[in-house]
Regions:
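Extracytoplasmic gating/loop element in the C-terminal half of outer-membrane beta-barrel translocons
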Residues: 28, 264, 316-408, 412
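Glycine-rich, aromatic-lined ligand/substrate-binding cores of catalytic
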Residues: 289-323
Length: 447
């Protein structure tokens, strides 16, 4: 057990100038003996400009605050006593004494040196604004840099040593982005309304992951984003005119190493290194990312006397999904022998040469089912998460029933989605069932 020591100093001058300093001295049992503690500081400053005397002349201004912060945090969750030697039992057993057999021990992975917890350097600047007794806005921009990330070293060391290689602690990723939220609310006698919205953008870039050698620059993960798609570039489907009378590809077309003989309706891939072959050296990192870069949402509210109506919307953008559900997108592939109507209607045939998906076959076809952008679709969506109609009983009536409040409501959830995928929920693309639509009737009572 390790004690953590923390100090916090807060400064507030006339509710105008604010500052906080936090200092943490934290230990971890997963670090080497004699080197188990690390220092993690953080500082934040703010200026509430609306409290300045010279700002009082702006009658529309309710609140204005400028702030900035910087801090360092640590994370040892991925550490696993990596500095210790490992010995593995097993293999053949032998009898040395009596009739009991004994297994031998062999050195496992090499111990790691320079074991460090992951560190994240976080910087943030923001503005908070209030106007006209009803409008509010908050804007934030951030930049984070994660360092000392634990990673495999097998990519940079030879495998001929016969033992598991030590981990390295020099992985690095940067994250940056921003968020903006705005809202307006107003009450006019018996009628009131409100609208709120927010949008955030976040992107990451891999600085170092200890990659081994790749013969082509487009094969390196470094410099790309976590979740960025890796695979072949599909350029369409082969047509009958791409083959000669004997069924062979015309001269100049790259030969597939995944399938001995291609046919019309098979996927046409780009030969990136122009060596006349389609193989693993033609895989590359593409623009598609399987992690949304933009999240957004907005809510609307109306009230009139005892009636209320509210709606919450949520969506994502800059997002791609990889369609790998065999029963829908890869018929007769592997152990799944079903064929979806969607695939039948969108597969290649001689009468549908511009189809989206390759020809249907009962035979194995490793060429068509390689990881490629053919199976990627735009995953952006906007969903109505909640729609609720409510009625609050009059006070005179609730008092007679000895209740302080009584509210009746009808609520619907996941009522509709606007997206680019015909038959699947982009939020649950590889699940058997989409997000469920549900309806609730309820009552809230306070006594």
């Amino acid at each position: 057990m390790f004690r953590d020591y923390m100090a916090h100093v807060s400064y507030n001058y006339d509710s105008r100038y604010l500052a906080d300093v936090v200092f943490s001295y934290s230990g971890s049992g997963k670090l080497p003996t004699g080197d188990k503690y690390r220092i993690y500081p953080a500082v934040s400053v703010a200026w509430v400009a609306s409290n300045e005397q010279f700002m009082k002349r702006f009658s529309a201004l309710d609140y204005l605050k400028l702030r900035a912060s910087f801090g360092i945090t640590g994370n040892d969750s991925r550490l696993s006593y990596d500095m210790d030697k490992q010995f593995n039992g097993g293999g053949n057993s032998y009898i040395f004494v009596g009739t009991s057999s004994t297994y031998g021990l062999a050195q496992g992975g090499f111990p790691s040196t320079g074991v460090e917890p992951e560190k994240e350097y976080k910087a943030n600047v923001g503005v908070e604004l209030g106007l006209w007794k009803g409008f509010s806005m908050q804007v934030d921009a951030f930049y984070n840099r994660r360092k000392q990330i634990k990673g495999e070293s097998s990519g940079i060391y030879s495998t001929v040593v016969g033992r598991g290689m030590p981990f390295l602690f020099n992985g690095e990723v940067k994250n940056y982005g921003g968020e903006i939220s705005m809202g307006w609310q107003q009450q006019l006698n018996h009628f009131g309304y409100s609208i709120q919205g927010n949008v955030s953008y976040a992107k990451n870039e891999i600085i170092n992951i200890n990659e081994g050698y790749h013969p082509y620059g487009y094969m390196y993960y470094t410099g790309h984003s976590i979740g960025q798609f890796y695979g072949l570039i599909a350029e369409g489907l082969y047509q009958k005119e791409d083959f000669d009378a004997q069924g062979n590809l015309l001269p100049g077309a790259p030969v597939s190493t995944y399938e001995a003989k291609l046919q019309p309706g098979d996927v046409k891939y780009k030969d990136l290194n122009e060596d006349g072959k389609i193989d693993n050296y033609d895989h590359c990192y593409q623009q598609n990312t399987t992690l949304p870069e933009i999240y957004y949402g907005f809510s609307l509210g109306l009230n009139y006397k005892n009636w209320g109506l509210k709606a919450n919307f949520q969506g994502v953008a800059h997002y791609s999904v990889w369609n790998t559900l065999a029963s829908v997108y890869r018929p007769l592939y592997g152990n799944d022998k079903s064929i979806s109507r969607y695939y039948l209607e969108n597969r290649w045939t001689e009468t549908t040469p511009n189809a989206r998906y390759p020809r249907l076959t009962t035979l194995s076809n490793n060429h068509n089912y390689q990881n490629s952008n053919l199976w990627m679709e735009k995953g952006d969506y906007l969903k109505l998460r909640v729609l609720e109609l409510s009625y609050r009983l009059p006070t005179k009536l609730t008092e007679k029933m000895r209740m302080s409040d009584c509210r009746l409501f009808l609520k619907g959830m996941n009522l509709f989605s606007i997206d680019h995928i015909d038959i699947m929920d982009p939020e649950q693309i590889n699940a058997e069932y989409p997000s469920s639509r549900s309806y609730l009737i309820g009552i809230n009572v306070l006594f």
